[in-house]
Regions:
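N-terminal regions of ATP-driven nucleic-acid and macromolecular assemblies
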Residues: 1-232
Length: 232
């Protein structure tokens, strides 16, 4: 089956993104998390809790007991991959065709939505690039290109999402702290330099021309609102 068009989902919750992937995937599918497992669990723990969760506070040991994460951890049809840096991410994507080929014997007897299909989901690619010199249109474009190619060659639908973090740019220097308060809610609306090179000049961060991350991603993906989980 031909892969559907790559998309970026406008989603505010990691839990919602995971549930979307679980509800819409078919064999073989993969959720690529752009962080370590520990950071991933920490982010899940730090998300606003629902009224039910507030009555039963989530702690690291109980995270995988929540319905969504229990399904993820026990799923035999959706693989989970952690890529803690750009090098690991690009290497994983470059060899994804081989990885999927080794999973050709997987069976899927579960009831699926008629629209279910193989999915390659990538969570927080922007955050992975942020603290590096590749946090630029050039760097992200290269990663998006490799991801799109991997999805195409495996007949998978590429689905990306980046969950906004209030402290996202706090490590870029004191001179950016004021700008942080004015930063857009969506990471995709953020401006970034076109090239990988950044230099300090006269006490300011010189990045040259900038472009929105969304404009970079639109070369490869369509942007879609996260559908209501009740309608899936």
């Amino acid at each position: 089956m031909a892969a559907s068009r790559p998309v970026v989902l406008d989603v505010q919750s990691i839990h919602d993104f995971i549930q979307y992937v679980l509800d819409n995937h078919a064999v073989p599918s993969t959720l690529v998390v752009c962080s370590t497992k520990a950071t991933f669990l920490e982010a899940l723990q730090g998300e606003p809790q629902s009224s039910q969760d507030e009555q039963h506070a989530i702690n690291p040991r109980r995270l995988w007991q929540t319905p969504t994460l229990r399904l993820l951890s026990t799923s035999r049809t959706l693989k989970l991959a952690f890529c803690p840096d750009i090098t690991h991410l690009r290497a994983y994507l470059a060899t994804y065709t081989i990885t999927v080929a080794k999973r050709s014997v997987e069976q899927d007897d579960a009831l699926r939505l008629p629209s279910a299909q193989p999915i390659m989901a990538i969570l927080n690619p922007i955050e992975l690039h942020r603290p590096t010199s590749a946090f630029s249109a050039q760097g992200l474009n290269r990663t998006f290109s490799v991801a799109t190619e991997a999805a195409h060659h495996t007949g998978s639908k590429l689905v990306m999402a980046d969950i906004a973090k209030p402290h996202a740019i706090s490590n870029l220097g004191e001179e950016l702290q004021t700008a942080e308060a004015r930063a857009p809610t969506s990471p995709w609306e953020e401006e970034l330099p076109i090239l990988n090179v950044t230099t300090k000049r006269l006490g300011e961060l010189s990045v040259g021309r900038t472009v929105k991350i969304k404009s970079v991603a639109e070369r490869w993906c369509f942007f879609e609102k996260m559908p209501s989980l009740d309608s899936i």
